[in-house]
A protein has these predicted regions:
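Alpha-helical transmembrane segments of multi-pass small-molecule/ion transporters
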Residues: 1-228
Length: 228
């Protein structure tokens, strides 16, 4: 569980931020920075908090950033510049496509780790849920304290609450091979943070739509006042 918390943000957080109507650029930027810092910060934090040393390859992280984040972002920018009108036509359905993709990912993870998840009991699931909730609330409250705007608050809360659980599973398997359950928290987190993140995204997206409606009403009122 500590190892999961010490890992950088995962790319799933970018998708959840998009579904939530948050600041995707900020989310991607935070993921890139935390991933590049992971070779230094993850071993240091795990050593301080758990008294164990894990090795994280810097170049593996760089390659991961390029393949999973930079290339998709650049392709998206290129596609929008090439066929912007067509992209705008399908942009409204993309959140639904993202949700379907996340459901398929969750299904795959559960299928692969079904035996471990069933055998873990309520304890590990509860700890993972609390871990995820506290991370999101920490990011949310920190953003609120500094009066960060709505979309960026959403991005920060999601980014802080969702870690790269796939990396956590890989590191646990490589560094704690003697303990077969070491990969369990990461596997459960892979499922849970997508579920909790999707719920949070739905709440924040509804809030964003309400704010947009209020802004529209205020603009109409202002126009009416000016006419009078």
């Amino acid at each position: 569980v500590i190892l999961v918390g010490c890992c950088p943000g995962g790319t799933a957080s970018n998708v959840i931020t998009y579904i939530a109507g948050g600041d995707v650029a900020l989310s991607v930027g935070m993921t890139i920075v935390s991933t590049l810092a992971a070779p230094l910060m993850t071993p240091f934090l795990v050593y301080v908090l758990a008294g164990a040393w894990v090795e994280v390859s810097f170049w593996a992280m760089v390659i991961s950033v390029v393949k999973v984040i930079l290339i998709p972002v650049l392709l998206g920018v290129f596609l929008r510049s090439l066929a912007g009108e067509h992209v705008d036509k399908v942009s409204d359905v993309m959140p639904l496509v993202s949700v379907v993709a996340i459901v398929m990912i969750i299904g795959g993870i559960v299928a692969v780790n079904a035996e471990k998840i069933v055998s873990c009991g309520v304890l590990v699931l509860g700890v993972v849920a609390i871990h995820n909730f506290c991370g999101m609330m920490l990011g949310f409250l920190a953003a609120k304290i500094f009066h960060v705007e709505y979309s960026r608050t959403t991005a920060i809360a999601i980014e802080v609450g969702m870690q790269n659980s796939g990396l956590a599973v890989s590191l646990a398997a490589a560094n704690f091979a003697a303990n077969p359950l070491a990969t369990l928290p990461g596997a459960i987190f892979s499922v849970w943070h997508n579920i909790a993140g999707s719920i949070f995204a739905g709440i924040r997206r509804a809030g964003a739509e309400n704010l947009a409606e209020l802004d529209r009403i205020r603009e109409i009122d202002c126009c009416n006042c000016e006419k009078q």
